[in-house]
Swiss-Prot record:
Residues 119-165 are annotated as: Disordered. It comes from the Bacteria. The gene is sspB. This is Stringent starvation protein B. Coiled coil: none annotated. PANTHER family: STRINGENT STARVATION PROTEIN B.
Length: 165
């Protein structure tokens, strides 16, 4: 049987390396290409077209390493977000502590998926990629922009500790 007729190896290798890293008490980090269609990550944390995501159980909730995509919930800067990454965009998985892991080689199945997704995205209207997860609205509604610098915390003098009995 020709390799092009087989299902992609990436989801199976990803799950195997993930389990292996956890079994060795290492922190699994996922490298994602954010330029590919279908990637839903907090873009403000992306650098040079990539983002590195900590997918350790203590860092994410509802992690799904499916055959077609990686999905989970996580907090970025204290804000809960839902992350969805097609397997075509997963470039590598490695350990934070020592770099052990692997980079994934290109696979024909993902090249086809990416070209199909590009065609669909070109013909589709602009869609909202992110949505509010818990339905809460912001406490204030002002004209601040996400690119503005956050306000500085008030400087009140020396910090103090109290004894609570």
């Amino acid at each position: 049987m020709d390799l092009s007729q087989l299902t992609p190896r990436r989801p199976y290798l990803l799950r195997a390396f993930y389990e292996w890293l956890l079994d060795n008490q290492l922190t699994p980090l996922l490298v994602v290409d954010v330029t590919l269609p279908g990637v839903q990550v907090p873009m403000e944390y992306a650098r040079d077209g990539q983002i590195v995501l900590n997918i350790a159980p203590r860092a994410v909730g509802n992690l799904e390493l499916a055959n077609d995509e990686v999905r989970f919930n996580a907090r970025f800067g204290g804000i809960p977000r839902q992350v969805s990454v097609p397997l075509a965009a997963v470039l590598a998985i490695y350990a934070r502590e020592n770099g052990a892991g692997t980079m994934f080689e290109p696979e024909a199945a993902y090249d086809e998926d990416t070209s199909i997704m590009n065609d669909e995205e070109a013909s589709a209207d602009n869609e909202t990629v992110m949505s509010v997860i818990d339905g809460d609205k912001p406490d204030h509604d002002d004209d601040t922009h996400p690119d503005d610098e956050p306000p500085q915390p008030p400087r009140g003098g020396r910090p103090a500790l109290r004894v609570v009995k």
